[in-house]
């Protein structure tokens, strides 16, 4: 008996992984499913690329107003393949947004949001909002002129909301003006809060799809 077979048997005896494999591989796929039904999966792949490249960049990025821009420049010019890692991160971000939009259109046009899949649609909408938040927070992290003024404009938008507007602006900025506290908050949102939030809603989304199956043709 080979070593690989022995290892498999060890796990099979304890976890019954063959049953899990059979369940995954035997799931019924309706005949009307075509390439456009892969858009959600492509969005997931883009997110995984984002996670991997973003994690790699945290080894070099310094979230301070005095060092952020220089750390990004160092990553692009001095770190081996740093330019490639950041470029892939940016390209996959654009691709993720595009695939998400196309996925939403596909689901809407094929009626995939209708009963009994309303909650699947709701989790998808929440993930779309989180994805936009990713773009807004990530755009500011290089802390160049574009990033700074983007933060200033975006964080000032809630000021138009009656009663709580000023509070929301101060909450986003970490004070009355844009500065170190703002960058720290946007960095925390971009690298911790938003990824984990998206991961939770993705899990919910996939579990519901797994339970209810793919919607039928119109």
Swiss-Prot record:
One of its GO terms (biological process) is photosynthesis. It comes from the Bacteria. GO terms for cellular component: plasma membrane-derived thylakoid membrane. The keyword Ubl conjugation does not apply. CDD domains: Cytochrome_b_N. Heme b 1 binds at residues 103, 205. Heme c binds at residue 38. Pfam families: Cytochrome_B. It is found in: Cellular thylakoid membrane. Its cofactor is heme b; heme c. GO terms for molecular function: electron transporter, transferring electrons within cytochrome b6/f complex of photosystem II activity; metal ion binding; oxidoreductase activity. PANTHER family: CYTOCHROME B. Component of the cytochrome b6-f complex, which mediates electron transfer between photosystem II (PSII) and photosystem I (PSI), cyclic electron flow around PSI, and state transitions. This is Cytochrome b6. It comes from Prochlorococcus marinus subsp. pastoris (strain CCMP1986 / NIES-2087 / MED4). The gene is petB.
């Amino acid at each position: 008996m080979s070593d690989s077979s022995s290892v498999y048997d060890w796990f099979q005896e304890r976890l019954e992984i063959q049953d899990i494999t059979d369940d995954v591989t035997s799931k019924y796929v309706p005949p009307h499913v075509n390439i456009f039904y892969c858009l959600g999966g492509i969005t997931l792949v883009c997110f995984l690329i984002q996670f991997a490249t973003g994690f790699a960049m945290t080894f070099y990025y310094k979230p301070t107003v005095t060092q952020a821009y220089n750390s990004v420049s160092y990553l692009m010019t001095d770190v081996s393949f740093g330019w490639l890692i950041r470029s892939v991160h940016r390209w996959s971000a654009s691709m993720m947004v595009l695939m998400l939009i196309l996925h939403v259109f596909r689901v809407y046009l094929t009626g995939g949001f209708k009963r009994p899949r309303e909650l699947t649609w709701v989790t998808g909408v929440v993930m779309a909002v989180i994805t936009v938040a990713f773009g807004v927070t990530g755009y500011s992290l290089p802390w160049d002129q574009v990033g700074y003024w983007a933060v200033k404009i975006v964080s000032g938008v809630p000021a138009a909301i009656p009663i709580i507007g000023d509070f929301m602006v101060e909450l986003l900025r970490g004070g009355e003006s844009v500065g170190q506290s703002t960058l720290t908050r946007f960095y925390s949102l971009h690298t911790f809060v938003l990824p984990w939030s998206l991961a939770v809603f993705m899990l919910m989304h996939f579990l519901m799809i797994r339970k209810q199956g793919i919607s039928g043709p119109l």
